[in-house]
Amino acid sequence: MDKLLERFLHYVSLDTQSKSGVRQVPSTEGQWKLLRLLKQQLEEMGLVNITLSEKGTLMATLPANVEGDIPAIGFISHVDTSPDFSGKNVNPQIVENYRGGDIALGIGDEVLSPVMFPVLHQLLGQTLITTDGKTLLGADDKAGVAEIMTALAVLKGNPIPHGEIKVAFTPDEEVGKGAKHFDVEAFGAQWAYTVDGGGVGELEFENFNAASVNIKIVGNNVHPGTAKGVMVNALSLAARIHAEVPADETPETTEGYEGFYHLASMKGTVDRAEMHYIIRDFDRKQFEARKRKMMEIAKKVGKGLHPDCYIELVIEDSYYNMREKVVEHPHILDIAQQAMRDCHITPEMKPIRGGTDGAQLSFMGLPCPNLFTGGYNYHGKHEFVTLEGMEKAVQVIVRIAELTAKRGQ
């Protein structure tokens, strides 16, 4: 465990922020830097079958140290950080033996407060790694990367029985491209776990069904003084569309298993406007109903427009709820839960109000629930991780490897 913090601090010092709307994968050069560093470290650690694909997927194998019919299992994390907040010049603060109250984030007025983030009350006495208030931290998912690398070092350096362990580090997870170029057959695991969750004990095998909705509105602009009966204001049509979306089914009004519509961006002029929504729901039927709702709204608002004016709506599915794939293999969850209990952790099964690479991989033939990392408040300046939580994640990874070996012997 000695190098866990050192690894994490090294990884977050590299700017690996991904970029949306870019065709190339990885979308940024910084991700290549971390992937090449990890490749070098895996080689130095003595892993085999190390490959780094042209699309930035790094894979490696830790050979089994016991004989038997032991399934090969995998652990996966992503190297990119969210494009939502700066990941450049990350300057972590280490707060040892947290005693409660506000934590100043750098020099200025920014604080990490238990008033806004009550989970801090549960972390008294622990070592917290925070931002300086100017960037995100990058625990999502460099905590997972550091934990997998440390678990490999533990397994390599100790006589802990384990089967073949596969690891992979992917790019562009935050922009939805992490698993698109993942070669499941080449990876060679029967199942895997993404290490990309939150607080200690989280074990996630349910995620949103997700879709994007892009709306283009073409209006007609004339001088306002002579506009009667002629002007078609694209911005007004956009406002009418959004007014039809259920106001109590948005991210800020929902939780748990509740789905939502989210207006992520809107721009335009009288002549043209564009809107971008995301749709999320755990239930597949409700998910399909939400997509139909958006089509009905566009049809209603666009009814009776001049032929030269129109509303164009394009819906694209992003990923689906992996539950239906993971529950077909209950032993995957059983092993993870037992590993947590063996490490004196109470498993907390909760839905992911988002997505992971594991969601797409599960539909590609690699069942892949999500393990905790010990991090909180991702994608912003209030992001932090606990050293104790990271250590627990390493212990759980190692124990999963050990329990899997016992099942096959």
Curated annotation (Swiss-Prot):
It is an enzyme of class 3 (hydrolase). Its EC number is 3.4.11.4. InterPro entries: ArgE/DapE_CS (IPR001261), Bact_exopeptidase_dim_dom (IPR036264), Peptidase_M20 (IPR002933), Peptidase_M20_dimer (IPR011650), Peptidase_M20B (IPR010161). It holds the Pfam family M20_dimer. This is Peptidase T. Belongs to the peptidase M20B family. Cleaves the N-terminal amino acid of tripeptides. It comes from the Bacteria. CDD domains: M20_peptT. Zn(2+) 1 binds at H78, D140, D196. It catalyses: Release of the N-terminal residue from a tripeptide. Zn(2+) 2 binds at D140, E174, H379. GO terms for cellular component: cytosol. Keywords: Aminopeptidase, Cytoplasm, Hydrolase, Metal-binding, Metalloprotease, Protease, Zinc. The gene is pepT. Signal peptide: none annotated. The lineage of its organism: Bacteria, Pseudomonadati, Pseudomonadota, Gammaproteobacteria, Enterobacterales. GO terms for biological process: peptide catabolic process; proteolysis. GO terms for molecular function: metallopeptidase activity; tripeptide aminopeptidase activity; zinc ion binding. The active site is at D80, E173 (proton acceptor). It is found in: Cytoplasm. Its cofactor is Zn(2+). Binds 2 Zn(2+) ions per subunit.
